């Protein structure tokens, strides 16, 4: 597997932050709780596959093969028509805002959600990135053949999780406890007086 840090981008940072800091939750009127890092990595890993963009730099993509899906979540059918009317563009914030509002029913004429009835974003496994990825694949993204892309989505999610775990990992206790040399100590080391 390639160095995960090479796929990190501003768009990915924004998506992870919005999902984990409660911003996305607020957009759903708290219907969906703030995501754990594993849940956020699972959603981003799935979106990477859906968009074909390994760093989420292109989120407003139109599916080439069947021409049906569009956007970060590759909305199809009625969900695609609502997406086209909302026109969130390529901005990751607007893409996630659209997803939140669509989930809570804003774009459904009957006031019901086009996907929220599944409760798929409310029931994602919290601490297992593979289980979370599979849950979202089956219940939220729902491709025609989930097995065709399952492993790629899982690998994407694991890469994303690794990136953000590395960024949030606390420094080792040894590194924290090691005293930092002051200017006098540094000068004494030069003359061989201090170690």
Protein language model features and the residues they cover:
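N-terminal secretion targeting segments of exported proteins
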Residues: 112-122, 145, 153, 158-160
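Peptidoglycan-targeting cell-wall enzymes and recognition modules
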Residues: 2-18, 23, 48-128
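Extracytoplasmic mature domains of secreted/periplasmic and thylakoid-lumen proteins
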Residues: 121-129, 135, 139, 147-153
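Short, functionally critical alpha-helical segments immediately adjacent to catalytic or ligand/cofactor-binding
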Residues: 37-54, 99, 135-137
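Extracellular cell-wall/glycan-interacting regions and their flexible linkers
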Residues: 1-41, 147-195
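Surface-exposed interaction patches
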Residues: 98, 107-110, 135-146
């Amino acid at each position: 597997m390639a160095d995960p840090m090479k796929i990190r981008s501003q768009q990915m940072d924004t998506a992870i932050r919005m999902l984990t800091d409660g911003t996305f939750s607020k957009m759903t009127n708290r219907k969906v709780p703030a995501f754990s890092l594993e849940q956020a990595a699972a959603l981003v890993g799935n979106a990477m596959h859906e968009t074909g963009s390994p760093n989420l730099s292109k989120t407003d993509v139109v599916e080439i093969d069947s021409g049906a899906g569009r956007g970060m979540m590759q909305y199809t059918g009625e969900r695609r028509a609502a997406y086209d009317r909302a026109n969130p563009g390529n901005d990751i914030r607007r893409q996630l805002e659209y997803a939140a509002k669509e989930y809570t029913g804003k774009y459904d004429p009957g006031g019901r959600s086009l996907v929220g009835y599944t409760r798929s974003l409310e029931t994602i496994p919290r601490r297992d990135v593979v289980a979370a990825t599979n849950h979202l694949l089956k219940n939220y993204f729902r491709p025609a053949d989930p097995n065709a892309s399952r492993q790629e989505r899982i690998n994407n999610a694991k890469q994303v999780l690794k990136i953000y775990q590395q960024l949030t990992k606390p420094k080792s206790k040894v590194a924290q406890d090691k005293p930092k040399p002051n200017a006098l100590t540094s000068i004494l080391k030069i003359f061989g007086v201090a170690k």
